[in-house]
Amino acid sequence: VLILAITCDRNVVFVRQYRHGVGEILLELPGGGFNSMEEDSLQAAARELEEETGYVSDHMVSLATLYDNPVKDTNTIHLIMAEQAQPSGIQNLDITEEVEIVLVPIDEIMRKIEQGEICVSGTIAALFLGLKFLS
C-alpha cells in the first residue's frame, strides 16, 4: 500500500528515507506491505501510516491498484488517500528504519515533482490521482 495522507491544513505527509537500490535519500509517500491475508488494503494503509509517520485518519478511500513493475514481478500497489490526517504521536518503526517526516503544502507538490525533488513513480501516481480526486 502507498498512502497519500492529507492534513486538515492541506499538507501532504511524506517520509524522507534512504533507498539502497538507488543509493539516495528520497522524498516519498509512506507505505508498506500487508501483515496477513486477512488484512485488506485500507487496514494495511491505516496501520502503515501510523507506524511510519505517527499520523492517523478515519477518512480513507482507495484511489487505484497498479502494477509496480510488470516486466519483472507481479507486485501490485494499492494507492490509498487518507484525508484529515492527524498526528497521533505514536510512530512505530521497524528497527532498521530511519524515517524523517516531512509535511509539504499541496500547492508546492507540482513544483517539487517538476524540480525532481519527488521522483518515485508510485508516489507521483498517487499524488496525481489524489489531487484530481480533491479538485
Segments predicted by a language model, with ranges:
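Conserved Nudix-box catalytic region and its N-terminal flanking loop in Nudix hydrolases
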Residues: 1-47, 93-95
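Short, well-ordered beta-strand micro-motif
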Residues: 5, 81-83, 103-105
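Recognition helices and adjacent regulatory flanks at domain boundaries
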Residues: 11, 18-20, 47-51, 55, ...
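Structural motif
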Residues: 12, 24, 74-79, 99
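A short coil-to-beta-strand element that immediately follows conserved catalytic motifs
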Residues: 56-63
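Active-site-adjacent beta-strand/loop module that shapes the phosphate/pyrophosphate-binding cleft
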Residues: 69-88
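Nudix hydrolase/Nudix homology domain
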Residues: 71, 78, 95-135
